[in-house]
């Protein structure tokens, strides 16, 4: 939750980022944040589920207001978003992101371009690899992450199939961009991606082996909070 500030208007996309409200609710912090989906709901708690739980993407419990989708996108286009939490399919070394086409499947970007273009902070959330990866949380002391098997497909690539978010343009606009995965967190810089956090019990080689391009390592590289790897609510 360090990436969110009380009072933020936060858009949520599908995928891992859709779990943000559940974490906020677990910690009892939902009051200060205003969650938004492009379907029109603003405020309250989005009724977004997960692959194993029933959800209704676009619906909100106790919304402050419900707008037309056109009005929501006008708000986004005007720079009203503080934070956008989005998924990703492929990431290039300059921070550019593809969500529209991969492995021969053309999905299209949907509202992704509109949402990410002017959000002050963009959080791309997803796994480092795709295709039946297997990781286990180690809840004992010290807590951490055990990587059993990487997915068949790398997602951080030298070349991506489409550019739906342009990294260099984001830097020029002054956007803050983070790429948050299960084992590593990267920050976008003018020189490309910089590794700033790594999961406990994971070494840098386990990150480098899953990424095609070279990235820099922050001199202030730190471990992710061990509490994130325990099956218990994290105290705010």
Named regions from a protein language model:
Residues 28, 234-236:
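Short alpha-helix boundary/capping motifs
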Residues 1-62:
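N-terminal active-site beta-alpha-beta segment that forms phosphate/nucleotide-binding
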Residues 49-234:
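Conserved phosphate- and dinucleotide-binding cores of soluble alpha/beta proteins
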């Amino acid at each position: 939750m360090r990436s969110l500030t009380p009072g933020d208007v936060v858009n949520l996309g599908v995928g891992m980022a859709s779990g943000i409200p559940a974490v906020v609710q677990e910690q009892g912090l939902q009051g200060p944040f205003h969650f938004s989906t492009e379907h029109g709901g603003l405020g309250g708690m989005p009724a977004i589920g997960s692959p194993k739980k029933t959800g209704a993407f676009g619906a909100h419990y106790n919304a402050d207001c419900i707008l037309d989708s056109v009005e929501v996108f006008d708000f986004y286009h005007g720079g009203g978003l503080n934070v956008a939490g989005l998924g990703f399919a492929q990431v290039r070394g300059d921070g550019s992101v593809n969500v529209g086409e991969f492995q021969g499947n053309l999905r299209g970007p949907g509202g992704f371009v509109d949402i990410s273009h002017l959000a002050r902070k963009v959080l791309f959330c997803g796994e480092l690899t795709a295709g039946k990866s297997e990781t286990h949380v180690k809840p004992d002391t010290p807590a951490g992450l055990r990587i059993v098997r990487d997915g068949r497909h790398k997602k951080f690539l030298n070349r991506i199939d489409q550019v739906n978010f342009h990294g260099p343009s984001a830097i020029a606009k002054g956007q803050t961009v983070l790429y948050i995965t299960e084992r590593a967190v990267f920050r976008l810089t003018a020189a490309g991606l910089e590794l700033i956090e790594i999961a406990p019990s994971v070494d840098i080689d386990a990150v480098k082996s899953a990424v095609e391009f070279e990235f820099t390592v922050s001199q202030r590289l730190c471990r992710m909070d061990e509490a994130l790897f325990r099956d218990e609510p994290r105290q705010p």
